[in-house]
């Protein structure tokens, strides 16, 4: 194991270029940026924790949701892809029983006393709660983890729908798994992270985000049994045809204050399920749902019913998207992407907040996307939890400049991210 200074020197000399190219691509422009980024993270680690310590460096990717918008938490299907935007963590094991994490862009140093295993008062919705919950998740699985010191630098847009939280969680999890030799596989790490987010952070999330960051590539998941989801990895290479680029646009409105809106989607879907003798919609026979629409409208309200309609139709679409990708039929996949986006807008109703109709960044971005991309073979949709954050578009290369210019006119310079899908999940890089 090398010291932070030794790793900085090795990175600058190009000794880690192959490892970086496997994650981000091998162009000199990309490698130069990542050398600088990793070197800066190592320098910051030294600033906070001192020089001369032996360290390891980890990466956990963000994800883009490709299908299955708000279906995973109802025990349906999910489809997502790991992306090249990621969190990098420099970490060194310690023996004092504390986890310390300093994250770029945040003033506070998270300090977790591992003797305090229970959720702490006032800590929910803060990163410290995730760290504490992940450590306790390992211990509940029989792995006696201890302390470490870490510095993290994330390029995953916070509150944007690319799941910065899952990247952070998986960064912490892969550190503990590696530093303490726990040997847990990627799905097990994802479940620990979900436990931390649900129980300690206080957000009722599904599992797809964590699974995608853990496994990498394009991931199709069947959550009929959420404790042991069936997953299928579709290799990232070849998913996008030549001449088509994945573009994610940040509308620069954050998800960070929208936990209540996300929870309402789940609660309303489950209210419909309860009227049909299920806990979640995945336990409900679709035929019976359609037969009992009048009663469901009366008991649950129209929005809950529309969100249930979205679930059933989106679930079928997600399976069809998976089949299209496996068959290499991007045209069919793109048509399904558009239908998914319309369903999220019209039925799931998570494109803007009804309580704040003046602020509709996602709606505006989708409207402009449709005006540019309709009939071109491209596609567009909102992604992630919704209400704010990012939209996703598959843009023909001939239209990239026009498309990005239109988005930047609305949301400012640098709002468009041209992404690649990433084959590797959370991993120790060096």
What are these regions (language model features)?
Residues 1-63, 88, 92-124, 220-381, ...:
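C-terminal nucleotide
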Residues 53-54, 70-77, 116-124, 154-162, ...:
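A short glycine/serine-rich beta->alpha loop
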Residues 59-75, 155-172, 376-394:
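Glycine/serine-rich anion-binding loops at beta->alpha junctions
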Residues 77-96, 215:
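Structural signature of FAD isoalloxazine-binding scaffolds in flavoprotein oxidoreductases
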Residues 100-102, 147-154, 184-195, 334-339, ...:
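Beta-strand segments within the central parallel beta-sheet cores of soluble alpha/beta enzyme folds
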Residues 135-157:
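Glycine- and acidic-rich phosphate- and metal-coordinating loops
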Residues 140-148, 176-192, 397-410:
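Phosphate-handling active-site elements
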Residues 160-248, 430:
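Fold-level recognition of mixed alpha/beta catalytic cores in primary-metabolism enzymes, strongest
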